[in-house]
């Protein structure tokens, strides 16, 4: 049944690249076969509950601009928000959604009331999922908005906050399992510091490692079959976050013996904040074997902060999905639109239009990436560039069969005096442009 929030808008359909209908897909065709697989199954789109239905449209210099009928902290409002959300998922044809606990339930006066409220809304979501066929890509706990978390959650100097945070994550993992979630995400928005003057770095990292081990242990205890994901971000809201980027997360996982247990959820905007490209972080995750899922958005390159805009750059998407596909594609993960409207975008249609544009952009990027892989457009030049490493002597060096002094003797014996080979960057950039 329609809530009326979106008026008489019908389900969004694919109309092809010549369509000028703003409420239609021009490139995203769920059933189109790309690289032997349905486009919908490649991309696994999800809608972010927080930015789409909870964000009030504020910024550091101004408050709420959006007027939503569910903007009250009551269970009745939470259920109305759920009604609108699942109507939105159905109109858009999004197969998945994601949420924080605080996005979906009213705030209680204590932990027990929060848990009661979450359990009630989980039951409501379960029925909505059954009615619509929409699934949960991942759940997570908001351990950063409430003032109790201002000095961190797992890394807080107060063990009571650590305990409260651990208990909250337990209930959110239970909720995620109940709803059949494919993943559980940890984002350490307050797990970092503002100044080292009041920070015991070693202690906080040990606390964070213990916390993550507790999460993994509980995953096995309850039989949760999804993937545990960490979402890297270098800063904002803290000056420095401990999960700075993919490489930092991998070092942290190795230190705590969790590199086989936890993967990463990579957000494009966070990669940019860390001084990386999106494809850099995806390639690093593949290299370390910890790629899990992506949060799709973009930052304004001039602003210098996390603007969470919908993607609109096809070449960027092509290179991103190239690395997703090169790593074997999504398994439990997907493409979550961690994107929000601009605060002047007041019309309910804007929610649909933003997602439609983002989905079309991703679809174009996916098709370009799949074609590049099919043609070997980048992989063939790459194989040629490293071909000499396949020689017997090179393989001996790589396998550790030659000691340093033996390598030195080999260079002297064979009078090895290498000349540089061309990198062909301009050629490869032109190749990519042919596909997009």
Curated annotation (Swiss-Prot):
PROSITE patterns: XYLOSE_ISOMERASE. GO terms for biological process: D-xylose metabolic process. Pfam families: AP_endonuc_2 (PF01261). Mg(2+) 1 binds at residues 231, 267, 295, 338. GO terms for molecular function: magnesium ion binding; xylose isomerase activity. Belongs to the xylose isomerase family. This is Xylose isomerase.
């Amino acid at each position: 049944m329609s809530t009326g929030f979106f008026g008489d808008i019908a389900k969004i359909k694919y109309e092809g690249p010549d369509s000028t209908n703003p409420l239609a897909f021009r490139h995203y065709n769920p059933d189109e076969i790309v690289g032997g697989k349905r486009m919908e199954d490649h991309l696994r789109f999800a809608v972010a509950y927080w930015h789409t239905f909870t964000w009030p449209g504020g910024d550091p210099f101004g408050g709420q601009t959006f007027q939503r009928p569910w903007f009250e902290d009551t269970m009745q409002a939470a259920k109305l928000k759920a009604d609108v959300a699942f109507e939105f998922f159905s109109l858009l044809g999004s197969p998945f959604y994601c949420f924080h606990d605080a996005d979906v339930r009213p705030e209680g006066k204590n932990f027990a009331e929060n848990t009661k409220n979450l359990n009630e809304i989980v039951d409501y979501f379960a029925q909505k999922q059954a009615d619509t066929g929409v699934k949960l890509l991942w759940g997570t706990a908001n351990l950063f908005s409430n003032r109790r978390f201002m000095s961190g959650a797992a890394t807080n100097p107060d063990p009571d906050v650590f305990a409260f945070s651990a208990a909250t994550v337990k209930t959110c993992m239970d909720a995620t399992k109940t709803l059949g979630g494919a993943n559980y995400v940890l984002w350490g928005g307050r797990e970092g510091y503002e100044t080292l003057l009041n920070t015991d770095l070693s202690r906080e990292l040990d606390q964070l490692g213990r916390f993550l081990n507790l999460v993994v242990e509980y995953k096995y205890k309850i039989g949760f079959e999804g993937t545990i994901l960490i979402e890297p971000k270098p800063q904002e809201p803290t000056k420095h976050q401990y999960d700075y980027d993919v490489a930092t997360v991998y070092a942290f996982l190795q230190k705590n013996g969790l590199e086989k247990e936890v993967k990463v959820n990579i957000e494009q905007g966070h990669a940019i904040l860390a001084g990386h490209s999106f494809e850099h972080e995806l390639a690093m995750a593949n290299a370390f074997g910890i790629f899990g899922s992506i949060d799709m958005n973009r930052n304004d390159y001039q602003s210098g902060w996390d603007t969470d805009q919908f993607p609109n750059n096809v070449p960027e998407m092509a290179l991103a999905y190239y690395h997703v596909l090169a790593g074997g594609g999504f398994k439990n993960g997907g493409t979550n639109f961690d994107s929000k409207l601009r605060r002047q975008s007041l019309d309910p249609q804007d929610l649909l239009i933003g997602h439609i544009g983002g989905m079309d952009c991703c679809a174009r990027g996916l098709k370009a990436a799949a074609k590049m892989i099919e043609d070997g457009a980048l992989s063939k030049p790459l194989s040629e560039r490293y071909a000499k490493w396949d020689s017997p002597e090179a393989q001996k060096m790589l396998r550790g069969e030659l000691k340093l002094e033996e390598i030195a003797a080999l260079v002297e014996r064979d009078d090895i005096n290498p000349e540089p080979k061309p990198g062909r960057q301009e050629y490869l950039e032109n190749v990519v442009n042919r596909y997009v």
